[in-house]
């Protein structure tokens, strides 16, 4: 058994100021009918238990996490759970400026990851609200000037592929690191003007999916060195490689390389369409503990109304799945 996972995602809210075509209605929260925001008092109870069970790195996501009215207090709460706690913030930059002083104060323990998918707001008939606007450029410059670890997350599809190389160059010039993610083909998307589900969603995802073969070759030729495995805080899920440009790097999350799966995944009815494997536990809106991206309801643990003892047992059930994982490919 390896070192137990110490990383958990927290989907604070399903609310978002944008509607990106590759996202789903509830964001990273797993339940398609549970919408809204975690109650702060209930969340604090669960986070305390999570920390006591060995989870010390908290990835805050949504929806858009900076929209919750207790965001400032949440940062302080997590930072005071213990001296070893860390926050990884997934955001589109909305309201982020309000919290820069606090983030700077804890900058040795907080990473900021801004979603930026294109140079222009409209690309090849697709709306990209998370583009490299002047506001985002200025925000990135301020984060770097304050010494805050900053990364752009870029979801690559056929729609924005023509802009990716220039976007990488501009990102490096700004001083931020980059993570490239291929599209996860799944059974639900907000879609390009129309929501798509089930078979229609799978077809939509396959149509706009862009492989990384040519892009990785380009990065290898442009970078000073490469690394086959490069992890910042969590080595589970899809293996990630890196390409270095001086002190900066471009990390590539490429699902064609397979993913780490638990033994419980072997007989799962969703395994043929699951490309993420077991990446991390996640707290979803609706007070649900599950595995990020997992569609199997056998591994959804409803925390609402449960005792502390029951919640601890659920965490242990989830965490045990990460004790024995194996790299496999489910793609054919």
Predicted feature descriptions by range:
Residues 8, 37-60, 68-181:
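Radical SAM/AdoMet-radical enzyme domain recognition
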Residues 1-40, 53:
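Canonical Radical SAM [4Fe-4S] cluster-binding loop centered on the CxxxCxxC motif
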Residues 21, 25-28, 196-199, 273:
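Short functional micro-motifs and their immediate structural scaffolds
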Residues 258-332:
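Flexible mid-to-C-terminal extensions adjoining Fe-S/redox cofactors in radical SAM and related proteins
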Residues 1-7, 18-22, 216-231, 296-297, ...:
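Flexible, acidic/Gly-rich N-terminal and inter-domain linker regions that tether
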